[in-house]
Amino acid sequence: MADTVRKPQKVVIVGAGPVGSLAALYAAARGDEVEVYELRGDLRDPSTIPLNFTKSINLALSERGINAMKHSNREELTKNVLRDTIPMYGRMIHGKDRGQLWEAAQAYDVHGRAINAVDRSTLNNALLDELEHTPNVKLFFNHKLTGADFRANKAWFERRVPGEAPLPNSANRVPEIEVDFDFMLGADGAHSAVRYHMMKFARVDYQQEYIDTLWCEFRIAPTENGEFRISPNHLHIWPGREFMFIALPSADKSFTCTLFAPAVHYTYLASSPQKLLDFFDVHFPGVSPELIPPADLQEQFATNPHLPLISLKCKPHHFGSSVAIVGDAAHAVLPFYGQGLNAGLEDIRVLFEVLDKHSVYDLDASHEARREAREKAFQAYTDQRCADTHAINDLSKENYVEMRWGVKTPLYKLRKSIEEILDRYVPSLGWQTQYSRVSFSNQRYSDVIKLARRQGTVLGLGLGSTFITAVGVAGYMMWKNPKQYSPLCFMRYCLRHVSHIWVKFFRNTAYA
């Protein structure tokens, strides 16, 4: 019968960033007719990139993002992207002690695994090039989503070309194009237009937070010989209690740096160029003049914008069978775990896995059956992903405290050492650091939190029991032999051994 003829689904994706582009590849691989609409111009155009990307925190690509790319079945694409990344095997903590600059490495992983620094435009260009050579994908740049009806499955876009004044119609409005779709994916960032229009149809719980921290980008130029000025295989951190300065390597042998600090500090630093130099000299020793000339530091601070950090959660991530949101549109996270990109790419893998699981791509199913299957799949996506994206949102906030100051505390180092020893020498226990679970596995973020808390409880009980036992034994010995084991001798013995442990593990160890 005529009504049983199967047609490909039409998928409209709003946003041509890395997450939207990967979603288009997944949908195209399943035979969908895909249209990608992007507000900005072609992101591969060099004249477009500075406007959108140069004032952007560098991206970190780790296991979750890589795994999502591999599941697109574009092996060469994944290889090409990874070839242009720079592996970072750990943090390099910088400081100054008694007038001497020092640095100490802290490996991310006891097994030597790395996260990858990637240039956003390089990643985006590779994905867009792949889409351009995919026959069932169409790209539309300079198109702004102005409206959507998610019951009628229609959307409206304005086409705005830079340099061209839009010609209004008789109603004095810029002409719009109407687009039909089977379902839409919103990958259009934290200020998502898709989410805005979806909230007119779905009862969405929405939480947005601007933390009291601004960020500003700086650049460490290559040496005169075109080499890196500091180790390229580390994320460099100059920590402070309320602020920090970080540096990530770039392919051109420079470092993209970011100053994170409360707004009050930015106001203070902006009041005088000399205050900026004094602040860096005290809190970020070794940055200027060693890595960034003072004049360049002042110019970059004055020229580059001082931008806020946004964190948002929402639930659900879909409405009916017609729309779902992914990436920052669904869960903008703070950049302090390096998981914003990875969580967004993982959204795509999870979404299409549940679409497959619910037989949305069963070619023998009717249009109505596929619609019903899609609605169930979108609900499953929301049920799974909301718990996980809320979890990584919370973890990212917590990691800001760790990066600013926790990396220097003995308690952090002690727990890290114990967990890494157990991971390396007793792997059957399944013990890992929280960071390893987040960055080097595909475990659900919500499960990572549960496991980390369980490990923390066990460690706390273990250390507490050890301490109580030691005190009990010491008390018994002092009671039996008060002259030989006086309290003063016992305190000296403990301090001597604590000092030995400190020197052995915390001052002379780089967690290699």
From Swiss-Prot:
Provide this UniProt record's keywords sorted from A to Z: FAD, Flavoprotein, Membrane, Mitochondrion, Mitochondrion outer membrane, Monooxygenase, NADP, Oxidoreductase, Pyridine nucleotide biosynthesis
Q: What is its main location?
A: mitochondrion
Cofactor(s) for this UniProt protein: FAD
State the Gene3D superfamilies in the record. Answer: FAD/NAD(P)-binding domain (3.50.50.60)
* Keyword S-adenosyl-L-methionine applies: no
Please state the pathway this protein functions in, per its UniProt record: Cofactor biosynthesis; NAD(+) biosynthesis; quinolinate from L-kynurenine: step 1/3
Quote a single Gene Ontology cellular component term: mitochondrial outer membrane
Q: Which E.C. number(s) belong to this protein?
A: 1.14.13.9
- Gene Ontology process terms (BP): 'de novo' NAD biosynthetic process from L-tryptophan; anthranilate metabolic process; kynurenine metabolic process; L-tryptophan catabolic process; quinolinate biosynthetic process
Give, as one word, the top-level EC class: oxidoreductase
Q: What does this protein do?
A: Catalyzes the hydroxylation of L-kynurenine (L-Kyn) to form 3-hydroxy-L-kynurenine (L-3OHKyn). Required for synthesis of quinolinic acid.
Q: Which family does it belong to?
A: Belongs to the aromatic-ring hydroxylase family. KMO subfamily.
The molecule here is called Kynurenine 3-monooxygenase
Q: Which organism does this record belong to?
A: Aspergillus clavatus (strain ATCC 1007 / CBS 513.65 / DSM 816 / NCTC 3887 / NRRL 1 / QM 1276 / 107)
- The gene that this protein is the product of is bna4
